[in-house]
A protein has these predicted regions:
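Rossmann-fold dinucleotide-binding core
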Residues: 81-84, 99, 105-216, 225-227
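N-terminal small/polar loop signature for handling phosphorylated ligands or for N-terminal nucleophile
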Residues: 63, 87-88
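Structural motif
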Residues: 12, 35, 55-57, 74, ...
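Beta-strand segments within the central parallel beta-sheet cores of soluble alpha/beta enzyme folds
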Residues: 13, 214-221
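Glycine/threonine-rich flexible loop motifs
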Residues: 70-87
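Short, conserved loop/helix-junction motifs that constitute active-site signature segments
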Residues: 90-94
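NAD(P)+-binding Rossmann beta1-loop-alpha1 motif at the extreme N-terminus of oxidoreductases
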Residues: 1-69, 95, 132-135
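The beta1-alpha1 cofactor-binding region of Rossmann-like NAD(H)/NADP(H)-dependent oxidoreductases
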Residues: 39, 58, 78, 106-108
Length: 228
């Protein structure tokens, strides 16, 4: 793509999840601007498509985006998010959109929604589920925050999301930190299930003295039933 062409969306953070999500957007035909403070991350990023631009300057990154600007944060939760938001606010205009795709605490997201609104910036907290593979090929997306922002980014998010029976695994939950709240509940359920699987294995292996093949057969049977 040419330097004059404006990008549809920008991604900040090119770690495992950020790079995978960016490639997902690129593969779906969205012109994507990429920014990372890490020179190593910028050099490591590769895509078979040419509809993206990588920046080491946050100002140039923002200038490359079409209006209203759509900025997707894929960075570590907590203070780094607040630091990046602080660096973005002077560069953005009213109606521009910031989306946080990390695992931020939902109450922090609600505060950020309110603070950004004071500057006329639309803020969203977005739960992303599916890990590296999901981010690349289609994650489950739990969106919360500004309903106005949702209407402007919905087409992009639904396009990159996983699909089940023809429908995008992507939805708007509610305002504030609702998206990150649902992701938190999702994670709690997931980790509880993983713990149950581990304890079940331990019971079969060390109490029932079952061999690896027997245990595998049990789990395979469960995979074919309602426990799948």
């Amino acid at each position: 793509m040419t330097n004059e062409q404006k990008c549809n969306i920008g991604v900040i953070g090119l770690g495992v999840m950020g790079a995978s999500l960016a490639k997902n957007m690129i593969n779906h035909g969205f012109c994507t601007a990429l920014y990372s403070v890490s020179d190593q991350e910028r050099k490591r990023f590769k895509s078979g498509k040419n509809n993206y631009r990588i920046f080491g300057s946050i100002k140039e990154f923002i200038s490359s985006l079409e209006r209203p600007r759509k900025v997707f944060l894929m960075i570590t939760a907590g203070k780094p998010v607040d630091m990046v938001i602080a660096s973005l606010l002077p560069l953005l205009d009213r109606g521009d959109i910031i989306m946080d795709g990390g695992n931020s605490f939902y109450k922090d997201t609600a505060v950020r929604c309110s603070e950004c609104a004071k500057h006329g910036i639309l803020y969203m907290g977005i739960g992303i589920s599916g890990g590296e593979k999901g981010a690349l090929y289609g994650p489950s997306i739990m969106a919360g925050g500004s309903p106005q922002a949702w209407e402007r980014v919905r087409a992009i998010l639904e396009a990159i999301a996983a699909r089940h029976q023809g429908k995008a695994c992507c939805g708007y939950i509610a305002e504030g930190g609702a998206g990150h709240y649902v992701k938190m509940v999702h994670n709690g359920i997931e980790y509880a299930v993983l713990e149950l699987i581990a304890e079940t294995y331990q019971y079969m292996r060390f109490v029932k003295k079952m061999g690896a093949g027997e245990i595998r057969s049990v789990f395979e049977q469960w995979n074919e039933g309602p426990l799948n």
